[in-house]
């Protein structure tokens, strides 16, 4: 386990042949595991407990680590670019969109670290204690860990939905206040970034759950037994999303669907307006999760990262 400095088993997927939906959903996951010859599970100490982490490296890296001595010598000193991938609100590091992205990146020689934020997936912490701000701290812990890996060359960040907000704000913060233990963020990918979360909190409506934004309750019951803490709402109403994100002026790729009913695409487009070096991809008929277009979104993002990082 890696402990971040802070001031402030391979899993076999089984499915029922009668369940076509599950087969389609897991297809990219199977391809991803096949393409990533080296898959490592670990934990990293985050802001609110240990974070569950999966590192997936391309075939050439596995050969360098596990191949013949002659081959290892030939590849000695070769390093690999890496993407740190952040999931959205109430989600986790799994899912077809991320599986397709990992598969596409591994094929292009780029490694990926994906992880569960505090209170999500297999990571420690309570969901009701989660805020965007402590997710930013989680992301920085992962970035410090990634920066410490001897085989990593360049680092990029990417995120979907709230993970996109975390990515945008983290990359902006690290420009305004550099961290000596974190390598420079060379590229950013935002997938349907949910900057609407601040406006939702100000309206007193988060995923259909109504409340008084001026006096939020201690917690709000959401789904699957999860409760959203009042501190999430209080911090969200004053979250300087765009004000922080605008500090990052490096390579950036922003993807959004014009059929997104969770986060209108104009919220993603505003990130594009803030950065002259950014690419803007508005995908026709794509929803918030890019359902049915996951592979297309993954190829756009991976082509961009291959161009910037290799």
Which residues does each predicted region cover?
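Conserved alpha/beta-hydrolase
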Residues: 102-124
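Short beta-to-alpha linker loops that shape the active-site pocket of alpha/beta-hydrolase fold enzymes
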Residues: 89, 116-126, 194, 286
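Short beta-strand element of the alpha/beta-hydrolase
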Residues: 78-88
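N-terminal cap/lid segment of alpha/beta-hydrolase-fold proteins
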Residues: 37-67, 72
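The serine-hydrolase catalytic nucleophile loop
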Residues: 90-102, 117
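Alpha/beta-hydrolase fold nucleophile elbow
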Residues: 150-161
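The alpha/beta-hydrolase serine catalytic core
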Residues: 51, 165, 170-172, 181-282, ...
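Alpha/beta-hydrolase active-site loop
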Residues: 129-149
């Amino acid at each position: 386990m890696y402990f971040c400095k802070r001031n402030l088993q391979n899993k076999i997927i089984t499915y029922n042949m009668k369940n076509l939906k599950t087969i389609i959903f897991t297809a990219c996951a199977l391809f991803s595991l096949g393409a990533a010859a080296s898959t490592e599970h670990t934990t990293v100490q985050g802001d609110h407990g240990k974070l569950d982490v999966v590192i997936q490296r391309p075939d050439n890296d596995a050969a360098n680590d596990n191949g013949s001595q002659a081959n290892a010598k030939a590849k000695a000193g070769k390093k690999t670019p890496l993407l740190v991938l952040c999931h959205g609100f109430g989600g986790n590091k799994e899912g077809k969109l991320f599986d397709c992205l990992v598969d596409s990146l591994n094929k292009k020689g780029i490694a990926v670290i994906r992880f569960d934020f505090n209170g999500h997936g297999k990571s420690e912490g309570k969901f009701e204690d989660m805020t965007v701000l402590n997710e930013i701290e989680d992301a920085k812990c992962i970035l410090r860990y990634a920066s410490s890996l001897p085989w990593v060359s360049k680092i990029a960040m990417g995120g979907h939905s709230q993970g996109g907000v975390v990515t945008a704000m983290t990359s902006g913060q690290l420009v305004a206040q550099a961290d000596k233990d974190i390598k420079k963020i060379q590229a950013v990918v935002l997938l349907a970034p949910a900057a609407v979360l601040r406006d939702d909190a100000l309206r007193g409506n988060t995923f259909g759950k109504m409340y008084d934004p001026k006096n939020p309750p201690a917690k709000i019951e959401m789904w699957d037994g999860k409760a959203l803490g009042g501190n999430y709402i209080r911090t969200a109403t004053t979250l300087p999303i765009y004000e922080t994100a605008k500090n990052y002026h490096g390579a950036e790729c922003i993807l959004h669907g014009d059929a997104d009913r969770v986060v209108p695409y104009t919220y993603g487009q505003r990130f594009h307006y803030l950065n002259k070096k950014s690419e803007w991809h508005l995908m026709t008929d794509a929803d918030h999760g890019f359902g049915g277009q996951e592979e297309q979104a993954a190829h756009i993002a991976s082509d961009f990262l291959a161009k910037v990082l290799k």
